[in-house]
């Protein structure tokens, strides 16, 4: 967790029971005024069970490739979540429930998923697509022992996260650019505006651990 000005920035793992507990603890103990989460409106409604059906017009909006990529990502998270008996996004739900308990305001700071997926499939190369699919197959089938040796219940160390993000940047530059870097800019800028507009308010932001380093660099430059 990082503290800067009136902001607490918490990096989480979307399938970690440890993240669920930490998020709830920080929000309740500090009695914050605003809880910002790494979701857009559509994903927020889906996570909270208020919007479960995927409509045809939504598939058209993000494209068939974007839709399939979204399903693949959700499936991978679900399989890993089963290992640790935690549903993907549980830490975001925990943040929302903790915010409701102390009557804190919820702020959705992520970029619209439709924009993100359109950007991804405009930038990604065939080479990266094949690498991505091969790495998933290799990870699930050939390196199961390595996954089992990694403690999915905990958020990896900052050093480990930095190495993983750098590896993504090197191996999948387009995926890094659209799924990490561009969203870092969007979320960090929204938080900076919020911090400046709500100077007297305590703000907790809950984002995936892979976003923290990049977001902190942007925030520090602008505060």
Q: What feature does the model see in each segment?
A:
Residues 1-223:
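Compositional signal for N-terminal targeting/processing segments
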């Amino acid at each position: 967790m990082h503290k800067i000005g009136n902001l607490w920035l918490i990096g989480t793992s979307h399938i970690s029971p440890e993240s669920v507990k930490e998020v709830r603890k920080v929000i309740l103990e500090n009695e914050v005024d605003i809880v910002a989460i790494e979701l857009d409106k559509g994903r927020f409604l889906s996570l909270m069970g208020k919007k479960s059906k995927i409509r045809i017009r939504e598939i058209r909006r993000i494209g068939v490739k974007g839709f399939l990529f979204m399903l693949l990502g959700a499936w991978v998270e679900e399989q890993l979540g089963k290992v640790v008996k935690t549903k993907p996004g549980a830490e975001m739900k925990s943040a929302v429930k903790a915010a409701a308990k102390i009557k804190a305001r919820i702020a959705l700071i992520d970029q619209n998923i439709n924009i993100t997926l359109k950007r991804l499939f405009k930038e990604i190369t065939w080479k990266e697509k094949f690498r991505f699919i091969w790495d998933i197959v290799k990870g699930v089938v050939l390196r199961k022992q390595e996954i089992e040796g990694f403690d999915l219940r905990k958020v990896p160390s900052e050093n480990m996260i930095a190495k993983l993000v750098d590896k993504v940047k090197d191996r999948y530059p387009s995926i890094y650019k659209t799924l990490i870097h561009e969203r870092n800019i969007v979320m960090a800028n929204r938080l900076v505006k919020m911090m400046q507009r709500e100077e007297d308010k305590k703000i907790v932001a809950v984002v995936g651990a892979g976003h923290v380093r990049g977001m902190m660099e942007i925030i520090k430059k602008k505060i």
